[in-house]
Design a protein with these regions (language model features):
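Cys/His-coordinated zinc-binding microdomains
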Residues: 18, 32-35
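Hydrophobic transmembrane alpha-helices and their immediate loop junctions
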Residues: 40, 85-356
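TPR/TPR-like alpha-solenoid helical repeat scaffolds
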Residues: 36, 73-94
Length: 356
């Protein structure tokens, strides 16, 4: 008597042991074989090739995609995680094709490496000079969010909320300033090969960017966090320049609001950008930040900024510091706070003088 024919294995069956592998599983429950072995091989080859070509952003993107297809208990997961950390470190140091190729940007990187007080001052000037260049060279990415319906709908709701209170010119200016700020996060996330959605705006509160992949380490988190206020500074500067050129106090009001919102976002607490920027600072650097903020408050005659200095001091005492110094983030943090607060104060004075 002939035996019944064995059914052909389905596409979801393990090729090694024949066990059924549910679509949500990353490894066979029977023998532990990787469910996406072929895809992982392709991603690894693409990542290696991208690294050799100097395209570190593409390499990180491929490695992160591979990490998503691996169970965390597999040894390959730890290996790729370390590989991502190494490539990410190179990106943080300004390596790779996506790094700005302007002489100004090269000067900033060289000054950071040399260190010193005078070097930091020069770096501030060079970086301030390149803010508008950043906005222009990243224009394509900045416009990316407008192609996403959820972003557009939330922008309309956000703009309408403030339009009803302050009128459309101020509402539109504030909306665009916040948009540039949030897209700064997205641009740097993509530089690190991290998939992220376009910004979603919440009327009366602000906006946020949904991550589709996790950041690998503190340095990525800090640089992504301060990217918002850095790009936001470009919007703040543009609004203030528009006021100086046209004399229209609406632009001064936009610059003032943009500066204040970005400065508040630099509070080193919770998930605010300042809190993310602080994660790579040692305890000593956090105390330097607190002292620097106090000096800014004194120079600008702004007692309210002393509150921020107090928060920095509290974080220096109570927070968990990094064991690795990060003078770049310390200097950038103080620069952004001074720039946003300074422009906000100047713009507010213009609005107050005009009696608006």
């Amino acid at each position: 008597m002939a035996s019944a024919a064995r059914p052909a294995p389905s596409p979801s069956d393990c090729k090694k042991c024949g066990s059924h592998v549910a679509p949500s599983l990353l490894a066979c429950p029977g023998c532990g074989a990787l469910a996406h072995a072929a895809t992982l091989t392709t991603l690894a080859a693409s990542a290696e090739s991208a690294e050799q070509l100097g395209d570190l952003t593409a390499a990180l993107s491929h490695w992160r995609d591979a990490l998503d297809l691996l169970p965390q208990n597999m040894p390959q997961y730890a290996v790729i995680h370390e590989r991502i950390a190494g490539v990410s470190e190179r990106v943080s140091n300004g390596e790779g094709k996506s790094a700005a190729a302007t002489p100004e940007a090269d000067g900033v990187r060289q000054v950071w490496k040399n260190g010193g007080v005078s070097a930091i001052v020069i770096a501030f000037l060079l970086k301030f000079k390149t803010i508008l260049i950043l906005l222009l060279t990243k224009g394509k990415l900045l416009l990316l969010g407008f192609a996403k319906l959820p972003t557009l709908f939330s922008m309309v709701a956000y703009g309408g909320y403030y339009w009803s209170r302050w009128g459309w010119p101020l509402a539109l200016g504030l909306l665009l300033s916040l948009y540039v700020h949030e897209m700064g996060h997205v641009i740097v996330l993509r530089r690190y090969g991290v998939k992220a959605g376009a910004p979603i705006f919440i009327p009366g509160l602000g906006a946020f960017v949904m991550l589709k992949q996790v950041l690998n380490n503190r340095r990525e988190n800090a640089r992504t966090g301060l990217a918002g206020p850095l790009y936001g500074l470009g919007a703040t500067v543009l609004a203030y320049v528009a006021y100086r050129v046209t004399g229209r106090t609406t632009f001064a009001a936009i610059a003032s609001l943009s500066g204040v919102l970005n400065a508040v976002n630099l509070l080193p607490i919770w998930t605010l950008d300042g809190g993310r920027g602080f994660v790579t600072l040692t305890r000593r650097e956090r105390w330097i930040a607190a002292a620097g903020v106090a000096i800014i408050a004194f120079l600008f005659h702004a007692p309210i900024i002393l509150m921020l200095a107090g928060v920095c001091a509290a974080v220096a005492i109570l927070g968990t510091p990094s064991d690795r110094p990060d003078p770049q983030m310390l200097a950038l943090y103080l620069f952004l706070l001074a720039a946003h607060a300074g422009i906000a104060i100047l713009a507010h004075s213009a609005v107050a003088t005009a009696g608006v």
